[in-house]
């Protein structure tokens, strides 16, 4: 009888564990009403062919092969995600190739993030990237007007970081001459395009040209980190107006010349995997 009494708590504990296991939600719905199937339990990033995983961008549901996700397993627990291709070919990484991420694989990565904008107008979200909404508007590193306008390059209008002007401004703010913010690699050159109304509809911010070098070397068609040169990268931002979505892409600055192909891939990754609602 005593043994049976001792078993009762153990049985109750086992029952609670079983209930906890069966109560894990298999779907997740975001604020905009998009419901996606969650990936429950261990995931195999090496699975080939890769299974489809669901992701939401605002109200839009996408179904994407899992090897295209940054972690090659699907969304994060909260539904956030980014997608990846590799430069220069803009092809997918092989299933599992990004596990134990190596420096060269990381450097080849072109990462795509999609942000649904509904709290403010999409155009305003774009403006916030190049018109200061906080801090000192006189800081020449934070405005188009504080930069050096250059001749068009790759179909883009460049606004280079004016490092002497920036350093003079920072010195007036009390910064030491050897402070990190005084160094070229702290700052970015901006490249823009404008729409018919003159509004900036694309912004690409890259490590300052004053850093020099590309930071990359090619062997057998693959790109590797050039350890004797500094590394430069770009952050590329544009809009999908009809879907109220801001797209942000990161890649090595050497890839700036291919920005149009990279942007076309960003669009394809979204629209080719869009399930609902169709627009």
Question: How should each PLM-predicted stretch be described?
Answer:
Residues 6-7, 27, 199, 227:
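Residue-level signal for mature regions of secreted extracellular proteins and peptides
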Residues 18-193:
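N-terminal export/ancillary region detector
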Residues 11, 32-33, 54, 204, ...:
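Extracellular secreted precursors and ectodomains with disulfide-bonded cysteine-rich loops/domains
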Residues 52, 59, 201, 242-244:
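Sequence-level motif detector for i,i+2 pairs with an aromatic at +2
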Residues 2-10:
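Bacterial N-terminal signal peptides
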Residues 213-279:
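Long, compositionally biased interface segments
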Residues 169-230:
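Catalytic cores of processing enzymes, dominated by hydrolases/peptidases
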Residues 14-16:
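Bacterial signal peptide processing site
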């Amino acid at each position: 009888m005593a043994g049976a009494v001792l078993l009762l708590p153990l049985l109750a504990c086992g029952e609670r564990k079983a209930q906890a296991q069966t109560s894990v939600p298999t779907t997740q719905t975001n604020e905009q009403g998009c419901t996606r199937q969650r990936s429950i339990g261990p995931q195999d990033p090496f699975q080939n062919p890769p299974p489809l995983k669901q992701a939401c961008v605002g109200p839009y549901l996408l179904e994407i092969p899992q090897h295209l996700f940054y972690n090659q397993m699907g969304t994060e627990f909260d539904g956030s995600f980014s997608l990846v291709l590799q430069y220069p070919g803009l092809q997918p990484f092989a299933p599992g190739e990004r596990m134990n991420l190596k420096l060269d694989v990381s450097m080849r990565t072109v990462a795509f993030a999609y942000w649904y904008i509904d709290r403010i107008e999409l155009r305003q979200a774009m403006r916030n990237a190049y018109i200061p909404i906080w801090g000192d508007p006189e800081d020449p590193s934070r405005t188009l007007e504080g930069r050096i306008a250059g001749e068009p390059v790759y179909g883009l209008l460049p606004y280079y970081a004016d490092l002497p002007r920036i350093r003079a401004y920072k010195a007036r703010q009390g910064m030491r001459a050897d402070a990190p913010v005084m160094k070229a690699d702290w700052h970015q050159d901006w490249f823009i395009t404008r729409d018919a109304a003159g509004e900036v509809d694309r912004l690409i911010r890259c490590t300052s040209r004053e850093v020099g070098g590309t930071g990359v070397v090619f062997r057998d068609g693959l790109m590797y980190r050039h350890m004797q040169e500094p590394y430069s990268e770009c952050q590329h931002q544009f809009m999908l107006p009809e879907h109220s979505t801001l797209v942000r892409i990161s890649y090595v600055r050497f890839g700036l010349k291919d920005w149009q192909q990279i942007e076309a891939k960003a669009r394809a990754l979204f629209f080719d995997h869009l399930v609902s609602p169709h627009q």
